Amino acid sequence: MRTSQFLLSTLKETPSDAVVISHQLMLRAGMIRKLASGLYTWMPMGLRALRKAEAIVREEMNKAGALEVLMPAIQPAELWQESGRWEQYGPELLRLKDRHDREFCVGPTHEEVITDLARNELNSYKQLPINFYQIQTKFRDEIRPRFGLMRGREFLMKDAYSFHLNQESLQETYDRMHQAYCNIFTRLGLNFRPVQADTGSIGGTGSHEFHVLAESGEDDIAFSDSSDYAANIEKAEAIPRETERAAPGEELRLIDTPDAKTIIELVEQFGVAVEKTVKTLVVHGVEKGQLVALIVRGDHELNEIKAANLAQVASPLVFASEAEIRAAIGAGPGSLGPLNLPIPCVIDRSVALMSDFSAGANIDDKHYLGLNWERDLPLPQVADLRNVVAGDPSPDGKGSLVIKRGIEVGHIFQLGTKYSEAMNCQVMGENGKPATLIMGCYGIGVSRVVAAAIEQNYDERGILWPDALAPFQIALVPMKYETEAVREATDKLYAELTAAGYEVLLDDRDKKTSPGVKFADMELIGIPHRIVVSDRGLADGMLEYKHRRDAQPQQVAVSDILSFINSRVHR
């Protein structure tokens, strides 16, 4: 492709509304253009990268035995009402009516549509297991679209759905899809981690997220420094570093703390070590009007997912108001603790191993110092309540946890029978009786993958594409293309490279465009391999080659350039 036949629309300045690096660089490199909030046009340069990601996803889905379909983007309300999600789904679901006043929605996901397809097309156990997938545009009406393609309203997604007679069959497909996802992200050249995840509102019995590691990620993930263990913060089990509780060394004291309403104020005013403090959080219980106290160490954070999963705690988690706390305990939120607490209490594992610690006295403006379990108060129920922190022991017993930010680019679920039961999706089983199908679902944000790759691969000059995603493999940049010798050598090399199957962008802009601008544009776009043709180099029989990640160029003989490129370009 020649730039004279291509739309090269780079920008010198970064648009003011672009915050994350992928948004900035995709706009500057002319890959996307904003149409409205959360809506983007894919320009020719960006679309080439998107299609490459899509092709790899499609190849690996086909290898995994999935069957490609294409379902409507617009879905009838009746299907969502049948599953129960029409009422449950929030304003992210864009709803509309046609000219006949029939209700529809723009699909953010396709569980209902695929379940309807399965119940109409599948009738025998002999057709199972079966796995359908599509690569299609989705729409979610995000309240605050931001970060370009990272959290837009319209996006390209690969979603797959499998149907099974039993859990064993589902597990086999789930494992196959897990491996397919690992293959996809490895082929895309991404530094990623598959992590154990909470099933959330989708439900089911098993879930993994796939995260690209990047500082701009919205999620915290924990992984072992000595094994393959990885989980998101919501799911990771918190193992205390201590193995047993130290013996008491202080007397119990009640002190006045009128100006210490927070852990920070208690630490600053009384010289208490933060790891010797606890914080008491009060939430609604499952019984109406009941409150439950949850206690974690002062330097730890409550994990709301773990808390909501406790049998005596209401789900979703609801924190008690100050009025409710005062009515039940007789003190405000800044003065709560486990001693003489009149409501049920659950403490974190790390709290159970504390000695000589400080806590609120359940009296306004008073705290206890030197508290000890089984001396001053009995040990209450103990549970895993907190988020893990860096340095915690890995739950698999191998090494310590590292915490990094991640961008979620894929998610797989074992759905079970949530949709098939609600929508009566059955086939005739081997015993001649109707059997409700068990489902799995598997998603990849294809357009988000492109942005995530940039978040992980860039420098001060622009994008550093992994080879698999680069819109072009080679940038061919002639100096003084208008001169006969340079033009002939450039055109000959361009023909040879394209005949060899390489994707080449020949920068044939005229002399009004300086060499510096040409180099800057190619580095901004991130084309991995650059070949410069100049009259001075040709006089010596040489061409200049530079990989986008190299600091300095090198000279390669004209006669050797094809073999050299063959050795450097991964195809």
Curated annotation (Swiss-Prot):
Entry function: Catalyzes the attachment of proline to tRNA(Pro) in a two-step reaction: proline is first activated by ATP to form Pro-AMP and then transferred to the acceptor end of tRNA(Pro). As ProRS can inadvertently accommodate and process non-cognate amino acids such as alanine and cysteine, to avoid such errors it has two additional distinct editing activities against alanine. One activity is designated as 'pretransfer' editing and involves the tRNA(Pro)-independent hydrolysis of activated Ala-AMP.
Subunit: Homodimer.
GO MF, any single term: ATP binding
Written domain comment of the UniProt record: Consists of three domains: the N-terminal catalytic domain, the editing domain and the C-terminal anticodon-binding domain.
SUPFAM superfamilies: Class II aaRS ABD-related, Class II aaRS and biotin synthetases, YbaK/ProRS associated domain
Protein name (database record): Proline--tRNA ligase
Keywords: Aminoacyl-tRNA synthetase, ATP-binding, Cytoplasm, Ligase, Nucleotide-binding, Protein biosynthesis
Subcellular location: Cytoplasm
UniProt similarity note: Belongs to the class-II aminoacyl-tRNA synthetase family. ProS type 1 subfamily.
EC nos: 6.1.1.15
Enzyme class: ligase
Any Gene Ontology CC annotation: cytosol
Catalytically driven reaction(s): tRNA(Pro) + L-proline + ATP = L-prolyl-tRNA(Pro) + AMP + diphosphate
The organism of origin for this protein: Stutzerimonas stutzeri (strain A1501) (Pseudomonas stutzeri)
GO annotation, biological process: prolyl-tRNA aminoacylation
Gene name, Swiss-Prot/TrEMBL: proS
